[in-house]
Amino acid sequence: GVENAYGFVTSIVDNGATKTINTEEEVFETKSIIIATGANHRKLGVPGEEEYGARGVSYCAVCDGAFFRDQDILVVGGGDSAVEEAIFLTRFGKTVTIMHRRDELRAQKIIQERAFANDKIKFIWDSVLEEIKGDERKIESVRYKNVKTGEVTEANFGGLFIYVGLDAVSEF
């Protein structure tokens, strides 16, 4: 049978036929391991990201999209999650702009086609976010840089959704 165990794993040792799992409280010996660590949203690490968390910066369109009704929304990322969430956010936003550091999206073609066909979605290509600005209560604008030309631009957005990947919650 399967035995579920929960805890903070400090190390795993492969003994060949068995594995030793050391946690903060117990040691387990087993033949197989299923690791379900969960994940945290990857952050950009730009000025303003922490300060404006829950005040315009979000990592969950389903959770926070309605707060930005009739505003211009920026989505950073180019993969499936970023593009799918941008499409979802068109239900609320006046416009939704996808900013991607490359000149093409990485999302699946069918998802890209839906985004390109949506009149509410705009694109900023070859660009990276450099700073999030606001009035201490909410974000008002972002500064971004075109990675090919070096041109720096500031643009107004009421909401910012960041989808640049996930990091597994593991330190072993």
PLM regions with names:
Residues 2-71, 148-150, 161-163:
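FAD-binding core/adjacent interface of flavoenzyme oxidoreductases
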Residues 65, 89-92:
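A short alpha-helix capping/helix-coil boundary motif
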Residues 77-79:
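Glycine-rich Rossmann-fold phosphate-binding loop(s) that bind the pyrophosphate
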Residues 82-83:
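N-terminal Rossmann-fold NAD(P) dinucleotide-binding loop
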